[in-house]
């Protein structure tokens, strides 16, 4: 018996732990399985999470164990989405949880507080919402908690674990005050509360955090003053509270913090003096105090004992006055000094040459005088020298040309005179040169033609003369050229057309003449062309219509003639068009109404005639419309009132007739209206009194107006001259009383009563007529229905003739031997061969299913393989119309679209389309496979070629006046050479009866995640909606993120922008692109691709580029042998 009891206890000792271990392991497996079931896993990252594996769960991806218990979960950047399961509380031994950079949503589960052994939690850059759970206080071992970049809200909980060392809740929407209880986190080393909506003051109790090294409070709504107690944080290394509303002075004690390296307090309301202690700290290297209201810097009694390591000092845009602080020149460690936008006066001290490590010196927008001291040449490392907006004088020093490290030299808005020194030729690294608004003279400085790195050149507002040299084309990197306000003469050199990077060209207010060279129409990126105030002649350049990026055109005050080109209507991004003071004739082209971004249209003082086109009402953003001093006639179109943004309307000195439209009362933003010197008649509409009090100028003089001036209008406009020249006009402010107004009023009243009586009688007679008509119609329909019923009964024996009609139709579409044949553009294939090749349209041969039917793989006996699309039964398009549309569609050919090779149309309602077979599937499958193989199958060059191929194909469709309507990865197919082909285009033509193609029903506007916002709202597809869809596909190619992975509040576009704003560029990289070197050209090309994607997905359709622009940008994004030319748009040879 004793032996049995002993054996029993031995059994318990040996097997009880094993049973306990098995139970705990199973509980952890169950918890992780529940966690997985909550998630969407597009990359299949959790496929290894199988309970049947030998060491489950310790051999699962991302799961770490210690002594067979789960202690770590690491699943970053795997595109996981869904809620974090409450069952995670079953992992009682968990020490580290890392789910960062995914798409988790919902709230942080309260049950996480049961994982009491947690040391670190990384949940940053997800889409989590709600509040921080108060139960977090139970995580008594927690050291790191990072939830940055989510959508968390509410107040910061008071009871956070006192064990915390790193707390980052930045980039959320937390509100309320910073809790003083944070002072209890005595082990805290990093506290990041930036980019939230926190209010109130910074609690002084934070000064108790002796271990705190990093305190970031930027971009909140904090007020009050900086607490002096923060100076007790003796371990503080980085203190940043920029972009708040903090005021008062900076405590001098901050300068005594022994380890402080960075102090950033810019964009606040600080005032008073800057304490000198900040410049006497050996550890402090960066001080940023710009955009405040400081009035002075405390001047030291002596700097003998002052040692500092300061490298960056930013005091820009304050109110500091007096002479430049001489003692600053003793801070020999300075690399960046910015005191621009202050009130400094006097001369620049020669001692500034002591700062030999200086790389950036910005003294712009002060009141400095004198000459540039020669000692500055001792600062040999300077790459930015900005003295713009002062009162410096003398000649530009020759020695500046020998400071070869200079990249930015800005001396504009001073009083420099003389010539540009020839030594400038040595500044080969110079990128920006601003010498505008000085008194420089001579001819165009030819020395500048050697500065091939220049991207911006401003010589405006000087006294240069002579011709603009042809050699200006040497500046091939130039994007901004401003030569306005000089005395240049001669013609614009045609070589300017070679400056392909030019975005702004300003040659205004000169003595230039001749015609505008046609080469200017070949500048692909130009947005601004300003040629006003010269003597240019010839016709208005029609070639400008091809400059799709053009936003501002000013050709006023020249001698241009001819008509306004109708093709200007293609300039959809045009914001301002000014052609005033020329000799332009003809009529105003109604096509201008297509320039939907137009805000300013100035055509004054020309020879325009004809009517004012009502199409101008289609300009919703129009603010200034000036058509004065022309020969326009006809009535003022009342539709102009639809341009509700209009604030200035000038139609004076024309031959306009008719009345002033009463609808003008809807122009609530109008401040000026000039209708003087015309032939307008009638009264001034009383409704114009409804125009807001913003109206300060109203001129209707010299017309044929009559009646009383509306009282409220007359009291607001007191100048009699603005109503003069209208002999029958009376009332204020004119000195003419409206004496007959009472009698006329009675006459009008009697006339009104008579009209009301007549209208009532007419309405009664009309209602009688309608009743009689309806009665007659109903009686006629009843009789017709009886006749048709009788006829049907008589014809019923003939119903079987339908079969004979089908057979007859079949014989007409057969070959000579009677077998139906497919219409092929390059080959002969019979229907029987096709049915056999698809195995009777067997389910196993289905390649894809869309709303346009099934796509089958067809294997013919001769080895040829094609794709056959069978359109849905019941197609409403009749046979003849289907054939006509298919013939047209078969002529649409390009190397990057799936070309229609043939078709079949015959009874019973069978419609087939023949395409080349694409053996390498579609883009959606390819991206999914790439993610499973860590992306190595899709490197950067291949992704770029795919994107470029799609862009070329879509661009060709748009040039062919076709809109796709459903651009998505599933509709991008790949041939044997992995060339991209766009499929499923033009099929609406073959399935919709209506000849109108402009309106598309809501179920055909595209695919969720890829369809543009405006297409979703309007139900209409356009080129712009295609471009938006392409942008989404491009971002998916580059980032590997599928649009459907995101929540309703955040889409892929917002996600990409958020990562860029945070500087988290690596988060955008698809796993296969992680090997890109940030210093390589491929990295830059990738970023350019991202920018193209964001341009295509702009919220306003008018801000999106055309597909030809996209192709141009993508071709320029990667230049090399791996980018084939797009010059050959023809399709590739087909096996069919």
From Swiss-Prot:
An example Gene Ontology molecular-function term: protein serine kinase activity
Residue ranges that the UniProt entry lists as topological domain Cytoplasmic: 773-1136
EC numbers for this chain: 2.7.11.1
Domain Protein kinase: from-to ranges: 841-1123
Subcellular location: Cell membrane
LRR repeat intervals: 93-115, 117-139, 141-162, 163-186, 187-210, 211-233, 235-256, 259-280, 283-304, 309-330, 333-355, 357-379, 381-403, 405-426, 429-452, 453-479, 480-500, 501-524, 525-546, 549-571, 573-595, 597-620, 621-643, 645-666, 669-691, 694-716
Alphabetized PROSITE patterns for the sequence: PROTEIN_KINASE_DOM (PS50011), PROTEIN_KINASE_ST (PS00108)
Glycosylation sites noted in the Swiss-Prot or TrEMBL record: 105, 138, 184, 192, 232, 269, 281, 365, 441, 474, 477, 482, 511, 535, 554, 594, 631, 669, 679, 699, 719
Residue list for modification Phosphotyrosine: 915, 1010
Ranges facing Extracellular side: 23-751
Major localization class: membrane
Leading EC class: transferase
Signal peptide as annotated in the record: 1-22
Positions of modified residues (Phosphothreonine): 830, 838
SUPFAM superfamilies documented for this protein: L domain-like (SSF52058), Protein kinase-like (PK-like) (SSF56112)
Annotated Low complexity bias: 799-815
Bilayer topology term: Single-pass type I membrane protein
Known catalytic reactions: L-seryl-[protein] + ATP = O-phospho-L-seryl-[protein] + ADP + H(+); L-threonyl-[protein] + ATP = O-phospho-L-threonyl-[protein] + ADP + H(+)
Protein keywords: ATP-binding, Cell membrane, Glycoprotein, Kinase, Leucine-rich repeat, Membrane, Nucleotide-binding, Phosphoprotein, Receptor, Repeat, Serine/threonine-protein kinase, Signal, Transferase, Transmembrane, Transmembrane helix
GO CC, alphabetical: plasma membrane; pollen tube
SMART domains noted in UniProt: LRR_TYP (SM00369), S_TKc (SM00220)
Family listed: Belongs to the protein kinase superfamily. Ser/Thr protein kinase family.
Protein name (database record): Probable LRR receptor-like serine/threonine-protein kinase At4g36180
Gene source species: Arabidopsis thaliana (Mouse-ear cress)
């Amino acid at each position: 018996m004793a032996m049995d009891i002993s054996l029993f206890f031995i059994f318990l000792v040996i097997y009880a732990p094993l049973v306990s271990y098995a139970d705990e392991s199973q509980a952890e497996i169950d918890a992780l399985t529940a966690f997985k079931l909550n998630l969407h896993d597009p990359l299949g990252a959790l496929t290894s999470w199988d309970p049947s594996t030998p060491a489950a769960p310790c051999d699962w991806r991302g799961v770490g164990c210690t002594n067979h218990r789960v202690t770590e979960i690491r699943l970053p950047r795997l595109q996981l989405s869904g809620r974090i399961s409450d069952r995670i509380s079953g992992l009682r031994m968990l020490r580290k949880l890392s789910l960062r950079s995914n798409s988790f949503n919902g709230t942080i589960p309260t049950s996480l507080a049961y994982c009491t052994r947690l040391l670190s939690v990384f949940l940053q850059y997800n889409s989590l919402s709600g509040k921080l759970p108060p139960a977090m206080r139970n995580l008594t071992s927690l050291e790191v908690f990072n939830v940055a970049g989510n959508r968390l809200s509410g107040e910061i909980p008071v009871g956070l674990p006192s064990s915390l060392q790193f707390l980052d809740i930045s980039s959320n929407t937390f509100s309320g005050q910073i809790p003083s209880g944070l002072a209890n986190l005595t082990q805290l080393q990093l506290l990041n509360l930036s980019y939230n909506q926190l209010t109130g003051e910074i609690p002084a109790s934070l000064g108790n955090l002796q271990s705190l090294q990093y305190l970031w409070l930027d971009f909140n709504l904090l007020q009050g003053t900086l607490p002096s107690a923060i100076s007790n944080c003796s371990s503080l290394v980085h203190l940043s509270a920029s972009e708040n509303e903090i005021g008062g002075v900076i405590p001098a004690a901050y300068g005594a913090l022994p380890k402080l390296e960075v102090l950033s307090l810019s964009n606040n309301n600080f005032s008073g003096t800057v304490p000198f202690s900040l410049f006497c700290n050996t550890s402090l290297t960066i001080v940023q105090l710009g955009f405040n209201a400081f009035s002075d810097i405390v001047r030291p009694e002596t700097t003998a004992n002052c040692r500092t390591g300061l490298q960056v000092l930013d005091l820009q845009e304050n109110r500091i006055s007096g002479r430049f602080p001489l003692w600053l020149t003793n801070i020999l460690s300075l690399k960046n000094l910015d005191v621009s936008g202050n009130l400094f006066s006097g001369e620049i001290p020669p001692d500034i040459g002591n700062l030999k490590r200086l790389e950036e010196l910005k003294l712009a927008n002060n009141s400095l005088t004198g000459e540039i001291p020669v000692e500055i040449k001792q600062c040999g490392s300077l790459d930015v020298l900005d003295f713009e907006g002062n009162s410096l004088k003398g000649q530009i020093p020759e020695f500046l040309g020998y400071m070869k490290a200079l990249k930015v030299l800005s001396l504009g808005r001073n009083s420099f005179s003389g010539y540009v020194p020839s030594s400038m030729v040595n500044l080969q690294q110079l990128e920006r040169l601003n010498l505008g608004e000085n008194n420089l003279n001579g001819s165009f400085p030819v020395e500048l033609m050697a500065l091939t790195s220049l991207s911006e050149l401003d010589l405006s507002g000087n006294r240069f003369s002579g011709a603009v040299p042809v050699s200006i084309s040497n500046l091939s990197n130039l994007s901004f050229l401003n030569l306005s306000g000089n005395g240049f003469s001669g013609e614009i050199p045609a070589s300017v057309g070679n400056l392909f990077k030019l975005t702004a060209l300003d040659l205004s207010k000169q003595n230039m003449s001749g015609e505008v060279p046609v080469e200017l129409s070949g500048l692909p990126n130009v947005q601004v062309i300003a040629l006003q105030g010269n003597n240019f002649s010839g016709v208005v350049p029609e070639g400008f219509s091809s400059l799709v990026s053009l936003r501002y055109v000013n050709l006023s005050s020249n001698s241009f003639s001819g008509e306004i080109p109708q093709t200007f209507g293609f300039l959809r991004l045009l914001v301002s068009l000014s052609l005033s003071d020329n000799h332009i004739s003809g009529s105003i082209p109604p096509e201008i109404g297509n320039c939907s971004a137009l805000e300013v249209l100035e055509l004054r003082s020309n020879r325009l005639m004809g009517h004012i086109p009502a199409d101008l009402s289609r300009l919703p953003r129009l603010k200034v419309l000036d058509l004065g001093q022309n020969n326009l006639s006809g009535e003022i179109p009342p539709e102009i009132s639809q341009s509700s943004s209009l604030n200035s309307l000038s139609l004076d000195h024309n031959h306009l007739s008719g009345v002033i439209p009463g609808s003008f009362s809807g122009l609530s933003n109008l401040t000026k209206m000039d209708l003087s010197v015309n032939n307008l008649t009638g009264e001034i509409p009383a409704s114009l009194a409804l125009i807001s009090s913003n109206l300060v100028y109203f001129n209707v003089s010299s017309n044929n107006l009559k009646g009383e001036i509306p009282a409220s209008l007359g009291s607001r406009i007191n100048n009699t001259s603005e109503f003069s020249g209208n002999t029958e006009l009376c009332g204020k402010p004119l000195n003419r009383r409206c004496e007959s107004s009472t009698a006329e009023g009675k006459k009008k009243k009697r006339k009104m009563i008579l009209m009301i009586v007549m209208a009532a009688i007419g309405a009664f007679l009309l209602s009688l007529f309608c009743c009689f008509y309806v009665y007659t119609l109903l009686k006629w329909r009843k009789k017709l229905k009886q006749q048709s019923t009788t006829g049907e009964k008589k014809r019923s024996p003939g119903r079987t003739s339908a079969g004979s009609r089908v057979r007859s139709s079949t014989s007409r579409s057969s070959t000579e031997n009677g077998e139906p044949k497919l219409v092929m553009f390059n080959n002969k294939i019979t229907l029987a061969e096709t049915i056999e090749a698809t195995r009777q349209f067997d389910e196993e041969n289905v390649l894809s299913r869309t709303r346009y039917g099934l796509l089958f793989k067809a294997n013919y006996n001769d080895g040829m393989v094609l794709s056959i699309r069978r359109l849905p039964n019941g197609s409403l398009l009749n046979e003849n119309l289907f054939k006509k549309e298919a013939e047209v569609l078969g002529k649409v050919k390009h190397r990057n679209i799936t070309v229609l090779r043939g078709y079949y149309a015959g009874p019973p309602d069978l419609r087939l389309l023949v395409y080349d077979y694409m053996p390498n599937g579609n883009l959606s499958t390819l991206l999914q496979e790439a993610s499973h193989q860590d992306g190595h199958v899709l490197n950067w060059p291949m992704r770029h070629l795919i994107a470029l191929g799609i862009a070329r194909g879509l661009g060709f469709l748009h040039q062919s006046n076709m809109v796709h309507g459903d651009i998505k990865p599933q509709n991008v197919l790949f041939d044997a050479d992995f060339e991209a082909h766009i499929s499923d285009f033009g099929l609406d033509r073959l399935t919709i009866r209506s000849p109108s193609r402009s309106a598309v029903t809501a179920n055909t506007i595209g695919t969720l995640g890829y369809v543009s916002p405006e297409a979703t709202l309007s139900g209409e597809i356009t080129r712009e909606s295609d471009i938006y869809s392409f942008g989404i596909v491009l971002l998916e190619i580059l980032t590997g993120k599928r649009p459907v992975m995101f929540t309703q509040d955040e889409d892929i576009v917002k996600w990409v922008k958020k990562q860029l704003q945070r500087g988290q560029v690596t988060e955008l990289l698809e796993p296969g692109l992680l090997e890109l070197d940030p210093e390589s050209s491929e990295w830059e090309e990738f970023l350019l691709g991202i920018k193209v994607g964001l341009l295509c997905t702009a919220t306003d359709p008018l801000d999106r580029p055309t597909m030809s622009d996209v192709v141009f940008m993508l071709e320029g994004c990667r230049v090399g042998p791996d980018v084939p030319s797009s010059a050959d748009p023809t399709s590739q040879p087909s096996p069919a």
